[in-house]
Amino acid sequence: MQLNPSEISDLIKTRIEGLKAGADAKNTGTVISVTDGICRIHGLSGVMQGEMLEFPGNTFGLALNLERDSVGAVVLGEYEHISEGDEVKCTGRILEVPVGPELLGRVVNALGQPIDGKGPINAKKTDVIEKVAPGVIARQSVSQPVQTGLKSIDAMVPIGRGQRELIIGDRQTGKTAVAVDAIINQKGKGIFCVYVAIGQKASTIANVVRKLEEHGALEYTIVVAAAASDSAAMQYLSAYAGCTMGEYFRDRGEDALIVYDDLTKQAWAYRQVSLLLRRPPGREAYPGDVFYLHSRLLERAARVNAEHIEKITNGEVKGKTGSLTALPVIETQAGDVSAFVPTNVISITDGQIFLETDLFNAGVRPAINAGISVSRVGGAAQTKVIKKLSGGIRTDLAQYRELAAFAQFASDLDEATRKQLERGRRVTELLKQPQYQPLQVWQLAASLYAANNGFLDNVDVKDILAFEKGLHDTLKTKYADLINRIEDTKDLSKDDEAALRAAIEDFKKSAAF
């Protein structure tokens, strides 16, 4: 049997016309390679930057590199079961996490999934993890305080609602302790907290969660944990996920506090992801956009005005301002604050609390260096009573540090210098504080007043903290009215000042310490 060439061409034509392509190359692709949690995928020509991709086995990934022939994606979670030739699908969605009050008291991973064994979280809303920070018009100036309960911070480096205050120092200088104390002190103050643990040991995170639970702070706190054993992608994303959870409260007229512990490890995780995606390295092998990595995160912490909240809630919440206060943590190497990531974050934030190894080892805890720690906007938010009383403390400490260095070489000192040194020693001792024991405003006011007015000058340095504790106990038992007035007004009137002076004199005579 012979076939005409025309018949053959007709046959081929009908076959081609009848062929239906099973896969759409726009929305599906094939895995070319998998290395260290990074997938190269062929196809997916319609994928968006930052879009969620679906891998086999209910695993998701994030499209980060869009190239001519392939897509570089990072796998969120386990990737051992993914192999070459697997099919990948576009989801058409940007990465979202659950938000809302249902998350309070829970420990979740970077995707908002519970990891504390307390059952599922029935959150009613989800939100995207990458958002544009509020614009200039939507913001309001920082004017309300966040009390950390730490004497040295509330007196010398005050933090306001909506501020970004960096906590920076070497390893083992008490950075996490400062942040956790600040969270514990928000009990009963109406501030919701988010603690983001990035790249820490799982045992360390468990310890922090246990301490928060012991002090009744977990009920108003969300813990977002990306441990050292989690993938670099999860560590990099956890900060943005935590920020979105905090923004939920900010955009409903509430106040929230978020701690990023720590952003150095987030930068390391992002560097790892970027190098695996073959992006060109820059200074210290970080990618070119490592500044943007932190700036777009920290700019989302702000105080927003009532109009912004009304617009976002469609008129449900009126006449309320909201705030998200950020306490990013940066770990330095041998006190080098001029390294790449520390200088970046210092320039983004509104001030820094610098913790020093030498002070920590000398027993000054929290080990805050008062000379180079600053708060660029917190002064406007400081409570009136603390603002009145704290000016002298900072001056005393600064002069003491200067004189102490000079006094090492001088044998005979004049009376004024000796007095200044004695006062400085007592103030340094007074600012020491045990962990998990934050102070209320009236306690801080009483301590500062005693220091400023020379009541500590004839108390032995070793007895200062006992004197302070005795004074607080006496005021609590005998002068409850005075305490209530200071707490209510957050100010010290002339009458209250006279009453406080009389109370301290009375306590000193009794020498109950």
From Swiss-Prot:
Enzyme category, top tier: translocase
Pfam families noted in UniProt: ATP-synt_ab, ATP-synt_ab_C, ATP-synt_ab_N
Entry GO CC: plasma membrane; proton-transporting ATP synthase complex
Signal peptide from the UniProt entry: none
Keyword Nucleotide-binding: yes
Site (Required for activity) location in chain: 373
Membrane topology note: Peripheral membrane protein
Keyword terms, alphabetized: ATP synthesis, ATP-binding, Cell inner membrane, Cell membrane, CF(1), Hydrogen ion transport, Ion transport, Membrane, Nucleotide-binding, Translocase, Transport
Biological function: Produces ATP from ADP in the presence of a proton gradient across the membrane. The alpha chain is a regulatory subunit.
UniProt-recorded Gene Ontology molecular function terms: ADP binding; ATP binding; proton-transporting ATP synthase activity, rotational mechanism
InterPro entries: ATP_synth_asu-like_sf (IPR023366), ATP_synth_asu_C (IPR000793), ATP_synth_asu_C_sf (IPR038376), ATP_synth_F1_a_nt-bd_dom (IPR033732), ATP_synth_F1_asu (IPR005294), ATPase_a/bsu_AS (IPR020003), ATPase_F1/V1/A1_a/bsu_N (IPR004100), ATPase_F1/V1/A1_a/bsu_N_sf (IPR036121)
Record's subcellular location: Cell inner membrane
Domain of life: Bacteria
E.C. number(s) listed in UniProt: 7.1.2.2
Keyword Transport part of the UniProt annotation: yes
Amino-acid positions noted as binding ATP in the UniProt annotation, renumbered to this chain: 169-176
Assembly mode: F-type ATPases have 2 components, CF(1) - the catalytic core - and CF(0) - the membrane proton channel. CF(1) has five subunits: alpha(3), beta(3), gamma(1), delta(1), epsilon(1). CF(0) has three main subunits: a(1), b(2) and c(9-12). The alpha and beta chains form an alternating ring which encloses part of the gamma chain. CF(1) is attached to CF(0) by a central stalk formed by the gamma and epsilon chains, while a peripheral stalk is formed by the delta and b chains.
Known catalytic reactions: ATP + H2O + 4 H(+)(in) = ADP + phosphate + 5 H(+)(out)
Higher taxonomy: Bacteria, Pseudomonadati, Pseudomonadota, Betaproteobacteria, Burkholderiales
Family: Belongs to the ATPase alpha/beta chains family.
Record protein name field: ATP synthase subunit alpha
